[in-house]
């Protein structure tokens, strides 16, 4: 077991991949709890698709793909916030419209450019094993910035989630809190997309948080548990993919393996809590 854990870390690319997925797991766990509290799961889906045209345009002009993703991702949440403040427009409808429009623009851009197929595959499924030092530093900066931002306004965000009327009565700027959370969610999704791809990035945010909600009702505990599950689940997933490929000649997609591990943890937690609830109910009846 010791060799199974340590052996992959001897390869430089695996060390970078493990650090990347641990950072993303920590970030996703912290942000994901607030996403679940505010029921913003669909927002993560919208963001992961609205960054598509930004990445495509950046590729077409030879610019940084991260910059393109940041511009369109943050622009989408700002536009969404502006639309949501209009009472005549339903928030879900606004997200659906942005989802369709940004994705369509991305498809149009891609259809006009050649040589994008390989990068499109990486965009969809990620390249966690190809993470370089620069990307690792960028992810670390995003993770630290987002976690610090959440920590500063954690109490306000929790109050906003459970009692928006009370938060407004106490003078908290709800619009600014919503905007801050939306931007943090966008940054977390964008950071995950580069390593995990648009298909899998959201799982790093939603799955650990959903698991933590099964295990505790306290928001602070949920954030700690979700961050731990995200980081360890990512590490274990990469180790399993490495071991299967190197020692058993079975090729497993690293990003997908990470998601499978996180989902297995969620399933185990769901079963365990269900059994525990039934046992306690029977004891109460007896």
Regions found by a protein language model. Name each.
Residues 6, 244, 251-286:
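Cytosolic-side transmembrane-helix boundaries in multi-pass membrane proteins
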Residues 33-116, 212-227, 240, 244-251, ...:
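Short loop segments and helix-boundary regions at transmembrane helix junctions
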Residues 24, 136-208:
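Helix-loop-helix "hairpin" substructures at the membrane interface of multi-pass membrane proteins
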Residues 20-29, 50, 54, 58, ...:
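Alpha-helical transmembrane segments in multi-pass membrane proteins
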Residues 14-23, 39-48, 66-71, 81-97, 136-141, 171-177, ...:
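Hydrophobic alpha-helical transmembrane segments
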Residues 4-14, 87, 91-155, 183:
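Transmembrane helix-bundle core of multi-pass membrane transporters
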Residues 1-26, 285:
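Membrane-interfacial amphipathic/re-entrant helices at transmembrane-helix boundaries
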């Amino acid at each position: 077991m010791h060799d199974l854990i340590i052996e992959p870390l001897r390869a430089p690319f695996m060390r970078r991949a493990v650090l990347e997925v641990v950072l993303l797991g920590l970030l996703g766990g912290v942000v994901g709890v607030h996403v679940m509290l505010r029921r913003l799961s669909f927002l993560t889906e919208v963001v992961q698709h609205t960054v598509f045209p930004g990445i495509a345009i950046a590729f077409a002009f030879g610019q940084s793909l991260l910059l393109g993703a940041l511009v369109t991702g943050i622009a989408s949440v700002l536009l969404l916030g502006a639309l949501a403040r209009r009472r005549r427009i339903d928030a879900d409808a606004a997200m659906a419209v942005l989802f369709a429009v940004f994705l369509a623009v991305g498809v149009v851009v891609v259809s006009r450019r050649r040589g994008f197929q390989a990068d499109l595959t990486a965009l969809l499924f990620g390249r966690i094993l190809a993470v370089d030092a620069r990307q690792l530093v960028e992810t670390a900066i995003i993770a630290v910035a987002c976690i610090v931002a959440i920590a500063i306004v954690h109490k306000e965000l929790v109050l906003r989630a459970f009692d928006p009327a009370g938060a407004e009565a106490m003078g908290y700027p709800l619009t600014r809190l919503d905007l801050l959370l939306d931007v943090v969610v966008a940054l977390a999704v964008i950071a995950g997309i580069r390593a995990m791809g648009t298909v899998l990035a959201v799982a790093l945010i939603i799955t650990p948080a959903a698991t933590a909600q099964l295990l505790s009702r306290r928001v602070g505990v949920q954030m700690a548990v979700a961050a731990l599950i995200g980081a360890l689940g990512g590490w274990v997933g990469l180790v399993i993919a490495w071991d299967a490929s190197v020692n058993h000649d079975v090729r497993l997609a690293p990003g997908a393996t990470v998601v499978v591990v996180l989902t297995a943890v969620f399933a185990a937690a769901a079963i365990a809590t269900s059994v525990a609830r039934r046992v306690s109910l029977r004891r109460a009846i007896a």
